């Protein structure tokens, strides 16, 4: 189970996936959110984005700024200035029964090396440790195959228990399209 109070880290080559909120780079995240790549989001005032990030479990993807690594293993300290944020998976959750994935991205120049699959595999392993998890949801247009293959997600209408169920939502003033 993901320990919400204790950051966890995974490394592969020059890349790091971390749940450490101290590594999150608001300016980099906002730049991605305001890009065409993350068309559904849009940037936020820095303080509002920090509030959203702190209220979520964030799996940040970072690339080492230099080739000098400061060690390996669980005792390694990761310093924000040594890493460039290049991706994010943000999960809004109660930490027990439900999660909602949003703000999922990897910058285009860092795509294609299996890093998206790696991030989703880490997330999947974390979710498997939640004994009372009922469901994880997300909205997607053309990436369902990626989430299906790596997380086992399906269109909600494919679940037997969802026959006749409608998904309801209301858009707020900050909704982006």
Swiss-Prot record:
Induction: Highly expressed under trichothecene-producing conditions. Its EC number is 2.3.1.-. GO terms for molecular function: acyltransferase activity, transferring groups other than amino-acyl groups. Keywords: Acyltransferase, Transferase. It is an enzyme of class 2 (transferase). InterPro entries: Acetyltransferase_Butenolide, Acyl_CoA_acyltransferase, GNAT_dom. SUPFAM superfamilies: Acyl-CoA N-acyltransferases (Nat). Belongs to the acetyltransferase family. Gene3D superfamilies: 3.40.630.30. The keyword Ion transport does not apply. It holds the Pfam family Acetyltransf_1. It comes from Gibberella zeae (strain ATCC MYA-4620 / CBS 123657 / FGSC 9075 / NRRL 31084 / PH-1). Putative acetyltransferase; part of the gene cluster that mediates the biosynthesis of butenolide, a mycotoxin that shows antibiotic activity but does not seem to play a major role in the spread of head blight in wheat. Butenolide is derived from glutamic acid via a 4-acetamido-2-butenoic acid intermediate. Pathway: Mycotoxin biosynthesis. Residues 81-174 form the N-acetyltransferase domain. The keyword Transferase applies. This is Putative acetyltransferase FG08082.
């Amino acid at each position: 189970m993901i320990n919400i109070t204790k950051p966890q880290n995974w490394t592969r080559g020059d890349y790091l996936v971390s749940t450490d909120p101290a590594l999150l780079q608001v300016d980099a995240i906002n730049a991605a959110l305001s890009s065409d790549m993350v068309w559904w989001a849009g940037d936020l005032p820095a303080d509002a984005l920090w509030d959203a990030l702190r209220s979520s479990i964030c799996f940040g993807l970072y690339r080492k700024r230099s080739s000098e690594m400061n060690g390996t293993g669980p005792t390694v300290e990761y310093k924000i200035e040594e890493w460039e944020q290049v991706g994010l998976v943000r999960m809004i959750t109660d930490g027990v029964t439900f999660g909602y994935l949003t703000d999922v991205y990897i910058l285009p120049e860092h795509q294609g090396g299996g890093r998206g699959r790696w991030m989703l595999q880490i997330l999947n392993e974390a979710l498997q440790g939640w004994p009372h998890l009922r469901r994880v949801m997300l909205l997607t247009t053309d990436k369902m195959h990626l989430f299906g293959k790596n997380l086992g997600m399906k269109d909600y209408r494919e679940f037997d228990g969802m026959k006749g169920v409608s998904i309801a939502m209301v858009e707020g003033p900050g909704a982006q399209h």
